[in-house]
């Protein structure tokens, strides 16, 4: 292959000069003689290409030889990647020796054509009450976990992986995009302790890595998930955190000298998001169900990054700081969270009516809060007092102990089937449990546990 030499280094951006007749294509991977991999981002003319470094550019100097590999970055795919931790280039970083893969795929691939895509309305039960009731997941759908800092996005995601791996025994791919190394480490040990590590491929590009790594690591993970899908499996693809993918794009964009757009984001924000999201789709052979954590800067859902992500999702799970401050975990906001699946034709009349009933009761309670704050409970009508009492029970019953949080809570995690969830909330709405004190509903699993607790009070 053609060889060139480094002519300029500005941080993570490196210009390489090649002979005029052998200029690499955009997205080709180049290898520096020091072992560093570069990815071509722009052709500047005159044999010059501008690249982004996928690793630290410390110690590089002008004149170093660079070889063109002739294709994009290629990463290992297939069952050999399960139980392993890899970096953006697919190299193992868990000190367990080589991956031993049978195939390598390019990380830049076309999305499946419209004819190949399939649309399923089958529900994926998560065992988390508030999600199964209010914003049910579709098998092969896209889910976003929206929340500010510290409201529980990663814990929710870990619980979902644990529940789905154990209850549905499917394969998962986890892409850690610009997250804390500590979380990556915790996550690995959590998967080991739950005995589900052999069903998960882990790909990490953490916070301390250069922007090129963080920008491409989501594509590395997605490529591995696509391989499982094309083998006819139903695979789960977890991204933590999609906001850092956008942020890495912003850094790269600035380094490449592009003019920023709104709030300083890259002008290509919507396109970059589309390139990733369009590939996360289900085909007639298999499905990819994706769960993406979305950090919301300053809790502002209208920020361009979360706003662009919203457009691609089937279900949005919004985590609220107000609910977390009440000590109700998972801190999902039942009035803000939505799902395209919550339709009587998909989930059935009973589920739909119970979910809307729960939202209606909580909405009414929200409206009455101002009156209660000014005049007190005694000024409410009997009907409104009943609404408030039931809403407070619903609020508490939406909380649930998690398996992955047993270390912190000291209580046993609970998996609640959809049938039990609907039965419990239907009972509360119909006044079946009006005699039970509200504290019995807090951090309980199914309604049977609540009744049992109340009998001991």
UniProtKB/Swiss-Prot annotation:
Name assigned to this protein: ATP synthase subunit beta
Top EC class for this record: translocase
Coiled-coil parts of chain: none
Gene Ontology molecular function: any one: ATP binding
Enzyme Commission number(s) from the entry: 7.1.2.2
Upper taxonomic lineage: Bacteria, Pseudomonadati, Pseudomonadota, Gammaproteobacteria, Pasteurellales
Species of origin: Actinobacillus pleuropneumoniae serotype 3 (strain JL03)
GO cellular component: plasma membrane; proton-transporting ATP synthase complex
Role, per record: Produces ATP from ADP in the presence of a proton gradient across the membrane. The catalytic sites are hosted primarily by the beta subunits.
One Pfam family, short name: ATP-synt_ab_N
Membrane topology: Peripheral membrane protein
UniProt catalytic activity: ATP + H2O + 4 H(+)(in) = ADP + phosphate + 5 H(+)(out)
